[in-house]
């Protein structure tokens, strides 16, 4: 029986639930994406929804923006500074301690790095940052409307209105300024100047290599995707990590001293992503006959047939994650051939391009190096600031096909110490 909170578009569709089966589904060239069909006005021909050679070319085009060197530069120049000034803005609550909704706080932290990756200008002020968040939120909900359990029509309508504002107020001014710079460099024959713009941000990258088959809205949709992807999934996952670690430290008080240890926090981050995948399921459509092995059965598909990959179930496959697969354990032992984060980042050619942004060097199994990714950087800073739940509070899940919380208030006991060091 399928769960009640399963998104409507996944109901009644043959389902792949094993870890190996979902990996095979994601890697198969006989299947194409069918997840974002209702939200197509927000995702048409973005890197998330295209397949085959077009996807390969787009991924190669955009990869330099998320290279290791680029991400380390983002972390040094933007992330750490942004984390601290966002923490500094948290207002005192009824008890006199800084208190806020954690999801909103992290979303704000990640909005600036997302805007930098996209190449949006003039979002550093509190007013412009807040306006960007105002237009991003309804677009984000519309982009993943397939997972919503409420009426979809008003969600899409609000998203389209916000998308127009996003184009007019943010993307178009940045596009015009950057296009003028590129045109001037080309007219001057300044090859070095043009090369220096390669990989600096999404808008520059797409304008430098513009494809005449793209419609004029293509840059808006791709920018929207990156803005959402850089913040939504990570902010949700970090709230889950804080919740899971709260329970872990309560059961294992001797491990509270590990709350600032990067290796421990990275394992906790990946275990959280395994248990609370940003995307619970994906939908694929067969373009040619194909068979997918799933546990002890084989699912046979003909062209046009739909099949879903249950990311959440695959990441709980006992044959890969052992006994106690349903519980949070940052010390879980798994085979080297299994991703510690399960199927959370997808796989095959559609593996999440932002995986290294989130997990740093650990995204490729490397445990050495200074780049830890945004997940651990933010999580460790929260614990340095003494994050905890308000007294007698337990977070409640939202009524949604996405695994998220409705509200997530937190209190900080040691904020002054953190901010005094930052100054």
Set out the residue ranges of the language-model regions.
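Cytochrome P450 heme-thiolate monooxygenase catalytic core
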Residues: 74-236
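Cytochrome P450 catalytic-core helices
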Residues: 220-224, 231-257, 354-386
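Residue-level recognition of short, solvent-exposed, well-ordered loop/turn junctions
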Residues: 300-303
